[in-house]
């Protein structure tokens, strides 16, 4: 999904960053991974994730020796333009046979990294944009699809990081790890941050929810839609002085804006014998549901029904009915999907009463908090039975 469309650097990017889980536990794949990534001819920076650990290590001290032998330090910084990039290793491994509660690792920035970061930022102008890259999110409001809501910081000593970042007014955080959700948390006074609010962005995944999940396409590749309804994809981060705009490019990749959102009727029109999707009788409680991929609470979404004017849709945190339907249809099969999880990028509105028989069109326009605009459309047919 990733390598072929990026050969030749069609987006003209300066470099790439992989925020952890470079491979899935098998560290012997690093050489092959590097060879494949080199085909894109794009400079790559890497961070270790929880799937890049030497699990036989007795503690955190030697957990990343294999990673370091292939990619270098696990935490570092560099400048590019007016941006100071900081990569931190916040995956703390308990050690072989040990655990932090019910997990063999936790989100935690070691003290020696915090000391290094304070010294590093002491030499950085307060006017620069600071981009913090970690594997485990700094903070998120996502859940795991099983109603376990991560309501606090995913990185336990997040507050210690905030203290070091206090002199800076332009910050953006990027992280991976969560294969169920993308989420943008505005870090503000409610988190103990008194400066200019900034975004801690848990990114949608290149691999999606995981390789063994979903239907198999004609290439033999599994559909890897995430539990929040995001397709798998990658990001092009665009920088303008001290501003960053994250552009999520979903699979299948391309510039077509209609690929950036999905429109669903929930519940769907009542199916008729021999009927097709979005053709049938309407329910009194049918809603139009839009999943704006990688969107968030500060984005705006409008619906246009047939020739009608713009109607603002209502933001809501809920599961995506499209994912619910896939989960239900393919449960207990070789093509089963992961359970639907609360999504941070859903908007809905009631399907208007009084729509007559025949074809109807829903057109969607969106504008995200960064000023990016998307459009999409869906037709449906009401049958009077």
Predicted regions and their residues:
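Short acidic, glycine-rich surface-loop motifs adjacent to enzyme active sites
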Residues: 19, 121-146
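Aromatic sugar-binding surface patches on proteins
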Residues: 42, 320-350
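Surface-exposed loops/turns
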Residues: 356-357
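N-terminal active-site segment of His-dependent metallophosphoesterases
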Residues: 1-31, 384-385
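Binuclear metal-dependent phosphoesterase catalytic core
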Residues: 190-295, 299-301, 350-352, 361-381
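Extended active-site neighborhood of metal-dependent phosphoesterases/phosphodiesterases
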Residues: 27-126, 148-174, 178-240, 244-248
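Conserved acidic residues
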Residues: 14-16, 130, 171, 347
């Amino acid at each position: 999904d990733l390598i072929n469309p990026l050969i030749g650097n069609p987006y003209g990017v300066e470099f790439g960053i992989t925020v952890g889980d470079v491979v899935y536990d098998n560290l012997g794949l690093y050489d092959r991974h590097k060879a494949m990534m080199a085909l894109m001819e794009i400079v790559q920076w890497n961070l270790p994730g929880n799937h890049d650990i030497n699990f036989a290590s007795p503690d955190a001290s030697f957990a990343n020796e294999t990673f370091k032998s292939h990619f270098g330090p696990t935490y570092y910084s560099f400048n590019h333009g007016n941006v100071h990039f900081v990569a931190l290793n916040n995956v703390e491994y308990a050690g072989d046979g040990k655990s932090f509660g019910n997990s063999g690792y936790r989100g935690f920035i070691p003290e020696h990294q915090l000391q290094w970061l304070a010294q590093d930022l002491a030499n950085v102008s307060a006017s620069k944009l600071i981009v913090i890259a970690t594997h485990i999110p700094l903070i998120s409001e996502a859940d795991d699809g099983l109603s376990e809501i991560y309501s606090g910081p995913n990185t336990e000593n997040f507050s210690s990081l905030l203290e070091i970042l206090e002199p800076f007014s332009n910050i953006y955080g990027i992280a991976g790890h969560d294969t169920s959700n993308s989420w943008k948390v505005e870090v503000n006074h409610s988190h103990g941050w008194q400066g200019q609010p900034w975004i801690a962005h848990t990114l949608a995944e290149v691999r999606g929810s995981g390789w063994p999940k979903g239907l198999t396409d004609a290439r033999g590749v599994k559909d890897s839609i995430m539990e929040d309804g995001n397709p798998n994809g990658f990001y092009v981060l665009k920088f303008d002085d001290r501003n960053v705009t994250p552009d999520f490019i979903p699979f299948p990749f391309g510039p077509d804006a209609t690929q950036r959102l999905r429109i669903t009727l929930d519940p769907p029109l009542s199916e008729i014998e021999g009927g097709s999707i979005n053709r049938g009788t309407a329910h009194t409680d049918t809603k139009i549901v839009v999943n704006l991929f990688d969107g968030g609470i500060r984005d705006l979404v409008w619906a246009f029904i047939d020739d009608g004017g713009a109607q603002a849709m209502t933001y809501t945190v809920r599961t995506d009915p499209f994912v619910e339907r896939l989960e239900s249809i393919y449960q207990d099969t070789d093509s089963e999907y992961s359970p639907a999880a609360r999504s941070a990028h859903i908007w809905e509105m009631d399907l208007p009463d009084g729509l007559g028989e025949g074809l109807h069109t829903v057109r969607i326009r969106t504008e995200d908090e960064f000023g990016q605009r998307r459009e999409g459309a869906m037709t449906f047919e009401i049958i009077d039975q």
